[in-house]
């Protein structure tokens, strides 16, 4: 899964097939929240090699190792399985086929339970899911074309989360990534995940949420991408350090201040209870965690902080 120990390029250079085990905590949060997280993980797996992956494990009913063993509601098995296929999986596989009588996974969900018959709800839903997959057999091996990409670079994340400051009680990096991803998916836009060693060409828009560390010549890639007509969206706390986690001198985002038409001057970290607001284009937006103070130099201001302390603005250039 999309965890901090992974580095995409190291993985894809050494493997032939990408697979993963998908065990969402369905019914804990709103279904659309859980579904969005699962979709993001699927797209990350597909993006590793830009080709279909394998869903190696999924549970036909409930696990036994999560904090609460919640049964999948009727119809959810089929929906979750088809979601995996829609995001690039060439398989839907289960753990486990038959429940064991003993040991640590004897109560883990299975296609065939201790009763052993075929006349169960779970067996029926597995059968219906299999029939639906048979109807979709012709799309096996097909690839997904994405016009949008998100830069998720593990080395940048490692460095950022190991830094002392600016918010040691939680940077909420993955929440930021999910907000970007969720916005694109609500628009029906397919999304690839990239690291900084990959090319940006072929995309219409690329997002860089909290790209703290710059490496692999990313500054030049971004500059060329924008010059060729692409749209690049970068958030606060980006371009702060080099590949050795040494702070850049001369201003941030390093090497791109002219591209974005601004310079980040200060970053204010907010307590959990702190709330600021951004006002612009007739709307007000809630702001939490960080307020990046910027000095513009050619960028168009779209949103202004409501707090008098935060005197600069998010911009477009």
Task: Please describe what each predicted stretch is.
Residues 209-316:
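A conserved amphipathic helix/loop scaffold
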Residues 119, 124-204:
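Aromatic-Pro/Gly-enriched surface loop or interdomain linker
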Residues 14, 37-45, 76-80, 122, ...:
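A general structural detector for well-ordered alpha-helical segments in enzyme core domains, enriched
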Residues 2-11, 309-317:
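Single conserved hydrophobic/aromatic residue that forms the stacking wall/gate
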Residues 22, 55-120, 145-167, 237, ...:
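Aromatic/acidic polysaccharide-binding cleft in carbohydrate-active enzymes
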Residues 6, 12-66, 80, 113, ...:
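Glycoside hydrolase catalytic-domain groove-lining segments
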């Amino acid at each position: 899964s999309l965890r901090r120990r992974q580095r995409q390029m190291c993985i894809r250079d050494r493997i032939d097939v990408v697979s993963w085990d998908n065990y969402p905590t369905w019914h804990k949060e709103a279904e659309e929240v859980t579904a969005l997280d699962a979709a993001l993980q699927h797209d990350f797996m597909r993006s590793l090699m830009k080709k279909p992956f394998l869903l190696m494990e999924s549970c036909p009913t409930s696990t036994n190792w999560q904090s609460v063993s919640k049964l999948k509601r009727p119809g959810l098995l089929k929906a979750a399985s088809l979601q995996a296929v829609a995001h690039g999986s060439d398989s839907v596989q289960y753990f486990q086929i038959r429940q064991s009588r003993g040991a640590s996974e004897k109560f883990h969900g299975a296609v065939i339970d201790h009763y052993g018959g075929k006349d169960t709800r779970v067996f029926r839903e597995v059968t219906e899911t299999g029939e639906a997959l048979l109807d979709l057999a012709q799309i096996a091996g097909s690839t997904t074309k994405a016009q949008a990409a998100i830069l998720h670079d593990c080395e940048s994340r490692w460095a950022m989360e190991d830094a002392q400051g600016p918010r040691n009680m939680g940077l909420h990096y993955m929440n930021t990534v999910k907000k970007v991803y969720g916005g694109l998916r609500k628009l029906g836009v397919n999304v690839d995940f990239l690291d900084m060693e990959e090319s940006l060409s072929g995309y219409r828009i690329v997002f860089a949420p909290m790209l703290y560390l710059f490496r692999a010549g990313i500054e030049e890639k971004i500059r060329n991408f924008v010059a060729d007509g692409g749209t690049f969206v970068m958030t606060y706390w980006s371009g702060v350090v080099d590949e050795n986690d040494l702070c850049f001198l001369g201003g941030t985002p390093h090497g791109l201040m002219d591209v974005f038409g601004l310079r980040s001057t200060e970053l204010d970290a907010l307590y959990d209870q702190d709330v600021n607001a951004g006002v612009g284009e007739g709307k007000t937006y809630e702001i939490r965690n960080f307020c990046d103070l910027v000095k513009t130099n050619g960028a168009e201001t779209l949103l202004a902080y409501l707090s008098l302390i935060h005197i600069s603005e998010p911009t477009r250039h």
